[in-house]
Amino acid sequence: DIIENLDRSKNLIIVTYNIFTKTNLILERLKLLENFEEIIIITNIPGRFEQYYGNQNEKARKEIQKYLDLLEPLNFKTHVKVYFNFSNHSKIYLTDEVVYIGSGNFSDASKNNIEAGVIIKSHEQRQKLYEEVIKKIELNSIRYFGKEIEKHKNKLSGYLKKIDLITDTLRELICEFNDD
C-alpha cells in the first residue's frame, strides 16, 4: 500500500532500522520523485558499534560510507531530510494517506521475508502517530546534511570575503575622513 500510494502523496516519512545498501530499487525510485514536498528518512546504521577491534574498524568505515553515499540528500530530486538514530529499531512508513507499522525493513530484501504489520488509513491516527512518535524520534536523531552543507559553507565563505572587502573599504574611508 505504501509504494502504490506514493503517486497520490506529497510527503513521505520512513523510519527504519535498515536500508539495504547493495541494491535498493525502492530507494532509487524515491530519488527520482520530483513532485514531493518532503521526504524524511530516519534510519540506524546496522553493524555500527561504539568500539571496534582489529580489521572491523575498516569494515565499519566502509559500511558507514555506503550509507552516507546512499542517503546523500543531493542525490534526491525532491527535498529530503536524512537523520540517523542509533537507538532506532522501529519500522514505520507514512504517506499522506497511509501508515505502515510492522517488521519489514525499507529494502527490496524484505519482500522475500515473512513480515507482519498493520496498515492505518485513518487521518486522525496518522496525525497522532506523527505528533506523538515520529516527532520524538526525529528530535532524538542526528541530521545528516551530506555535501549540501559544503555547498553552503562555500557560499558563506564567498560572502565573508565580500564583507571583509567592504570592511576594509569602510576603514579606509573613515581614516581619510579623520585625516581631513
Residue positions per predicted region:
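Short beta-strand scaffold segments in enzyme catalytic cores
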Residues: 90-94, 118-119
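Primarily the HKD phosphodiesterase
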Residues: 2-76, 176-180
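Short, surface-exposed amphipathic charged segments that create phosphate/polyanion-binding patches used
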Residues: 55-58, 96-101
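Conserved RecA-like P-loop NTPase helicase motor core
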Residues: 81-91, 103, 109-110
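Signature of lipid phosphatidyltransferase scaffolds
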Residues: 100-179
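Beta-sheet entry/capping signal
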Residues: 11, 38, 91, 98-99
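Short beta->alpha connector loops
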Residues: 18-22, 87, 97
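Generic beta-sheet signal
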Residues: 42-44, 85, 102-103, 121
